[in-house]
Amino acid sequence: MKVLVVGGGAAGLMAAGAALRQGHEVTVLEHMEKPAQKILVTGKGRCNVTNDCTAEEFLHHVRTNPRFLFSSLGAFPPAKTMELFESLGVELKVERGRRVFPVSDKAEEIRQALLRYTDGADIIHDGAKKLLL
């Protein structure tokens, strides 16, 4: 099956990588010049990957409509996020507040890991501000 992912941010690249691993042909449309650029400014340039807690603990701290996230966090809890990045060669550390960062303290390492995860996807820079499907 052909899969189109609109947006090459962290979530879009995660979706693209998952689709690739299911054997789909994947195209990612991204309006920025390079995918996952915003990752570089998260966590003061270090990228807070996730929190080291269970899905239930995570949802307990969501103030607005936690039920919306229930199924996705049940299927892909924080521990799986950590396992994924470690499998992509990123060493992780847990800091105050159970926040998880790359040991390197460089968000670029997370960005590069996501690009490796999507290796095989067609990533197209379209420059579009609006997209009609």
Where are these regions (language model features)?
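Glycine-rich FAD pyrophosphate-binding loop
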Residues: L4-V6, L20-K44
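Glycine-rich active-site loop/strand segments that organize a redox cofactor
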Residues: R46-V94
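A conserved short coil-to-beta-strand element within the FAD-binding core of flavoproteins
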Residues: I124-L133
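Short beta-strand to alpha-helix junction loop
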Residues: L69-A79, R96-R116, I124
